Amino acid sequence: MITETYNIMPFTSDHISGALGLSQAAGWPHRAEDWAMLLSVSKGMVAMDGDQIVATALVTPYGDVATVNMIIVDEKARGKGLGRKIMATAMALISPHEWRLIATVSGRPLYEKMGFKVTGEIMQLQGHSNPLSTHEISGDDLSWATLDDMDNLLMQDWAATGLKRDNLFKYFGKMAKVVVLNGHNGFGVMRDFGQGQVIGPVVAKSIEDAKKIYSFLLNTSAGVFVRTDVLGNENLSIWLEQQGLERVDQPISMAYGSSGSPKSDLEVFAITSQALA
């Protein structure tokens, strides 16, 4: 394996334009704004071949847990051990008890070699929903969250996921639309991403409550391209397909190490994104 010709250095905002070219070449939907958002809550490394970025890896700390994400290697630099090297270098930046990631088919062999184990599956759905067919909503069930709600929603998220995501929820409070089930029994987040908007996380006590959250958000985004990543719930995925979304991919979730299982009557129905868990 030959990696000595690549200069691996910390990922800074100056690298976003080069990273954008790399993700676009890989067919990923991220905009420059999406890279900037990820970098604002993460640390990372880039591999340079001269003045060209040929690989990236980010790590996003959430207390005892972290995700490793945006692992991309330029096609011409593959097969030289660069993916493993930049991933390991990025992971050395922080020391959580547990690592999580979402694996593509092409990335899974590398992650398994690094000790990651399969923990579940993700259903990626996207498209334009039909607001006329969405779940019946009572106006008393849901409301838009305010900044005063964010601390409570952060605690709900922590209880459901085991992730301490203070910085992410500060971002949500400023840049996302957040709907909350009255009685604080769940919430959903929608924000700009890629070709349109992404819905996630969605946290609720039941699939019926999750459908209410989705219906509320889908009705507010009629005509807009929407993506969501459902966490292993086939029934919810089928229902979303009935609302007009299309299942386009089914990657797997993987983990290395353990921080213990969260104990809560709240359930995660959709992750924030494949990068952010």
Predicted regions and their residues:
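A short, well-structured alpha-helix characteristic of acyl/acetyltransferase catalytic modules
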Residues: M1-T3, T12-L22, S133-H135, L147-Q156, ...
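Active-site rim helix/loop that mediates acceptor-substrate recognition in acyltransferases
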Residues: I16, L20-T56, W158-V178
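Conserved beta-strand in the GNAT
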Residues: V46, Q52-T60, V65-I72, H184-V198
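Conserved acetyl-CoA-binding loop-helix of GNAT-fold acetyltransferases
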Residues: V73, G79-A92, K113, I207-N219, ...
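Conserved GNAT acetyl-CoA-binding A-motif
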Residues: L93-V105, A222-G232
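Active-site/acyl-donor-binding loops of N-acyltransferases
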Residues: A103, M114-S133, V203, R227-A277
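Amide-forming acyltransferase catalytic core, primarily the GNAT-like/NAT-type
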Residues: F116-V198, E208-D209
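Flexible loop/N-cap segments at domain edges
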Residues: G186-R191, Q197-G232
